[in-house]
Amino acid sequence: MMVGYPLFLKLEGKQCLVFGGGKVATRKIEALLKRGAQVTCVSRDFCQPLKNLAKTVGATRRVAPTLQLKQMKDNRIVLNGAQLVIAATSDRKFNARAAQVCRRKKVLINVVDDPEMCDFYVPAVVERGPLQIAISTSGTSPLFAKRLREEMEKIIPPSTGKLLKKLGKIRGYSK
């Protein structure tokens, strides 16, 4: 397995598609919305937390994040202009077909719990204001990445975010 190239994507206003309506899909959608993405979630069923999330989406930003829940009526895979796709279903065959369609259309896809089918991995992230530290095992052991993130969160105090914001202002004055 080739090691990935680490980068941070600006997802504000970008069309993202998530297949699946369970707890894992909900977590992925929450992370996308936090970054201002326009999310469409397609599934046969939606868990209650996801339905609740759909009712509360709409922060005050330049481009507000959106969430649309669409009922899947058949197994067709329609990307509708999505720029990023996450397949979070329990149907491995569907996920594999979604990956094939995305590759054909040159759209990046993450297939949850199947690193071989992924074009990108979603890292465990430590966030302290503008500080973001991404931890990835390239899909080898997400549990290890999660545990390392938890340890780093203990080490890096929440006040780090405030400090960085002050340093950013100082940097602005020194330009």
Describe the predicted segments one by one.
Residues 84-89, 95-121:
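ADP-ribose/adenylate-binding Rossmann-like module
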